[in-house]
């Protein structure tokens, strides 16, 4: 249960399109003249996330060793299941092709000069044209409609607040408490505060909407490189799900399954939260420096 949950957290930090609040982050960053592309996000996250894919299962294994450590019949069971499923259907092949096309276009969006939203609408249109999806399928995706509707409102509000100077004022107010400190220390403190502030939120989108822009503004005003501050706090918006059993949707679902007691969930989350922070406070900035992102 915990390995599955933390795999979800790591992939949410790894891919821009893996988590709904990530799209909010990209939009908020754009209001601050910081452009984050799909490929740029992935390039910045790939090394720290791959490292976490190795470290996190190891820590979980040491803290809670599995009851079953050998599965000699796993391959036979998998082969049998594949035979029962049969060959890929035409609709499944079309879905795979559209998925690959979408990822390629997202990766090349800067080169081709196209927006990520255009690619998303293109993919949906192709799936509708070829009958892979129906309008009924689209209407039933209430979560996606919520993001689509509220994202535009939130982006508009963020832009207006920025124009009115509220974000700048809030950034200066927070920065006054960190006055005189090196930008490295300021950014580290902001990341820790941003991470643990999620104990007060049950929604990552609400957290991002409330705190992301002001915290990035404070970091930049302290002298931190804009892209570095934007990306580290973006990653923090994904890994902060490792705080509680109500931190995001998957946490609530998996915690309610009953496989992990609430006390064990909080204990494991605290330990892994420290690991996430260490990796994204050390490995991520160094890697982004190597690839020239700041």
Regions found by a protein language model. Give the residues of each.
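Juxtamembrane and boundary regions of transmembrane helices in multi-pass small-molecule transporters
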Residues: 2-7, 12-24, 29-86, 235-294
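Short helix-coil transition sites and intra-membrane helix breaks within transmembrane domains
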Residues: 11-21, 113-115, 159-167, 197-210, ...
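Helical membrane-embedded segments and adjacent short helical loop/helix-boundary regions
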Residues: 45-49, 86-97, 115-118, 139-155, ...
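Flexible hinge motifs at transmembrane-helix junctions and intramembrane kinks/re-entrant loops
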Residues: 58-65, 88-93, 101-141
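Core transmembrane alpha-helical segments of multi-pass membrane transporters/permeases
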Residues: 137-169, 182-200
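Generic alpha-helical transmembrane segments of integral inner-membrane proteins
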Residues: 50-59, 96, 100, 104, ...
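Hydrophobic alpha-helical transmembrane segments of multi-pass integral membrane proteins
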Residues: 180-222, 226-227, 233-234
């Amino acid at each position: 249960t915990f390995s599955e949950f933390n795999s979800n957290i790591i992939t949410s930090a790894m891919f821009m399109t893996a988590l709904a609040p990530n799209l909010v982050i990209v939009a908020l960053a754009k209001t601050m003249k910081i452009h984050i592309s799909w490929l740029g996000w992935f390039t910045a996250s790939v090394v720290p996330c791959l490292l976490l894919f190795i470290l996190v299962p190891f820590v979980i294994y040491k803290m809670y060793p599995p009851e079953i450590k050998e599965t000699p019949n796993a391959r036979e069971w998998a082969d049998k299941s594949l035979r029962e499923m049969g060959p890929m259907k035409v609709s499944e092949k079309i879905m795979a092709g559209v998925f690959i096309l979408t990822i390629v276009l997202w990766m090349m969006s800067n080169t081709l000069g196209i927006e990520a939203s255009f690619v998303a609408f293109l993919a949906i249109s192709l799936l509708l044209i070829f009958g892979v999806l129906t309008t009924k399928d689209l209407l039933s995706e209430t979560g996606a409609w919520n993001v689509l509707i509220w994202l535009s409102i939130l982006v508009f509000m963020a832009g207006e607040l920025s124009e009115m100077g509220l974000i700048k004022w809030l950034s200066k107010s927070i920065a006054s408490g960190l006055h005189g400190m090196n930008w490295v220390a300021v950014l580290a403190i902001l990341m820790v505060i941003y991470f643990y502030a999620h104990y007060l939120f049950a929604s990552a989108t609400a957290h991002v909407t409330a705190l992301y822009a002001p915290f990035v503004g404070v970091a930049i005003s302290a002298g931190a490189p804009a892209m570095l501050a934007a990306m580290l706090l973006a990653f923090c918006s994904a890994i902060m799900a490792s705080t509680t059993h109500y931190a995001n949707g998957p946490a609530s679902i998996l915690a309610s399954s009953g496989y992990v007691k609430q006390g064990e969930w909080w204990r494991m989350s605290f330990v892994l939260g420290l690991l996430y922070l260490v990796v994204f406070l050390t490995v991520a900035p160094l890697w982004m420096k190597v690839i020239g992102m700041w």
